[in-house]
Amino acid sequence: EIMPSLVGSEMCIRDSHIALPEYNQAASSESAILYGIRKEKACAPQLNSGLFAAMKEMGDVRGVFVGHDHDDDYAVSWKGILLAYGRYTGGNTVYNHLTNGARVIELDENANSFRTWIRLKEGVVQQVTYPADFIKE
């Protein structure tokens, strides 16, 4: 079960530029279900501020969306919260090995879930529903 205590509460998502240290823990976990591309380790702070633990304690945050690492666009569930990267959208940068695009998030507050996908010029890729697509049978 991913969100047993969250049914009926408000659904929140968080947007940030830099990934939390938990991104590396989640992406390297053998039990994790990960969708998307991970070409580099998250450039997360070495000092863990406890922000993820605080969001978990609050109980309403369903997803955290970040950027910064241009060669990542994955989504992975960690302790009941989806940790996902956007997609590099364009402009001048030091590096970028993925096609430009964007992450779209569609909330469904009635179902206490959301869909997210990467939108490219050529169409949609990596469409997932959270939490349904991250539950192990």
What are these regions (language model features)?
Residues 21-50:
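Flexible internal linker/loop segments at domain or repeat junctions
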Residues 18-24, 61-77, 91-93:
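Active-site environment of divalent metal-dependent phosphoester hydrolases
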Residues 13, 63-65, 84:
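Hydrophobic/aromatic beta-strand patches that form the interior of the parallel beta-sheet core
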Residues 16-18, 118:
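A cross-domain feature marking catalytic cores of carbohydrate-active enzymes
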Residues 1-8, 12-13:
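Single conserved hydrophobic/aromatic residue that forms the stacking wall/gate
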Residues 44-45, 67, 94-98:
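Short amphipathic alpha-helix initiation/capping segments at coil-to-helix junctions
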Residues 37-39, 55-63, 67:
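N-terminal short leaders/motifs
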